[in-house]
Regions:
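Extracellular glycan-interacting surfaces
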Residues: 1-234
Length: 234
């Protein structure tokens, strides 16, 4: 059996991976970011669910903040959701904090060069957030201590728009994909972004939307494209 928590155009959902205390759904933009307790927590509104962000709470800016289907990433270790919070040329990340308490709140990471289009949280740290951010203008940003820091370092700048990024076996190894035609669609670094290699190989000129390195085999990478799922073993 299943339970419908919400409906509409849909968006990215997030589930607490550590203690499975909550899940988060989104509608469009940051217009209806909804937190649901899975363990019976009563939030400050007196219910077991609450809006983290919604234009219905009187803040009309939420209904156009970010993208229509808005990207984000959940740090389950620290109970923080990072989401695109850009609006009207002001490029920033919205940081929803204290998600495991009955009074979550939010703030912003500001000063980004362009609008975030992809996020990835390192699995190699657990007491702080190491956050990778890709933008719609091809920049790759690294934010260490993103749970408290407001400073992003640019470690890559490519032609196209970033669709996905991942750390590999450590935080020096990074994979990046771009979803445009006529560009290099897969980039790779083994030194934290000092040097980048092109990894399209024999892939056709097609948008690449996702990438997943195999944690058990350093040579194997799975790639999601507009023309199906591909893999490489070298």
């Amino acid at each position: 059996s299943s339970t419908e928590f919400t409906g509409g155009d849909g968006g990215f959902p997030y589930i607490d991976q550590i203690s499975t205390k909550y899940l988060i759904s989104n509608y469009v933009y940051n217009d209806a970011v909804y937190l649901y307790s899975l363990v019976g927590t009563t939030y400050s509104n007196g219910y077991s669910s609450m809006y983290l962000s919604s234009s219905s709470d009187g803040d009309s800016s939420d209904d156009t903040e970010g993208d229509f289907i808005n990207p984000g990433a959940l740090d389950s270790n620290l109970d923080i959701l990072y989401a695109n919070g850009s609006k009207s040329g002001n490029f920033k990340i919205r940081r929803f904090i204290d998600l495991d308490t009955n009074s979550p709140s939010d703030n912003y990471i500001t000063g980004l060069p362009n609008s975030p289009s992809a996020f990835h949280i390192s699995t190699h740290t657990s007491t702080s957030t190491t956050l990778l951010v890709g933008t719609d203008h091809g920049e790759v940003l690294l934010i260490r201590d993103a749970n408290s820091s407001n400073s992003a370092s640019q470690i890559g700048n490519f032609i196209g728009s970033v669709s996905n990024l991942k750390f590999g076996s450590n935080e020096q190894e990074i994979y990046v994909t771009l979803y445009n035609y006529g560009v290099v669609n897969i980039k790779y670094t083994s030194d934290g972004g000092t040097n980048w290699d092109d990894k399209d190989g024999n892939l056709p000129d097609i948008p690449v939307l996702a990438i997943q390195p195999n944690p058990y085999s350093s040579d194997e990478v799975i790639i999601g494209t507009d023309l199906g799922v591909w893999k490489t073993t070298n």
